[in-house]
Amino acid sequence: MCLSEMIPGQSGVVTIISPHSKIRRRLQDLGIVPGTHVVCVNNSPLGDPKAYAVRRTVIALRKEDAAEIIVRETGNA
């Protein structure tokens, strides 16, 4: 599933970041690499961006950027 499809409280592990992503390097700098555990924390009022907990910090990603990240669902946080 894409990271953008996660709902608040759902968790997963990053498996793939699209090699065509415009922000691939920025995601890596933020610690989002294959094997990273992520939790969808919250939706903004209009649903975009969403907040994700990654490596003891919370980051916001736009839907179009989160769609470039494939995760394996691990359940609820």
Kindly label every feature range from the protein language model.
Residues 1-2:
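Absolute protein N-terminus
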Residues 16-19:
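A structural micro-motif recognizing beta-strand termini
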Residues 22-26:
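Short alpha-helix capping/helix-loop boundary micro-motifs
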Residues 44-77:
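C-terminal structural segments of small proteins and small subunits
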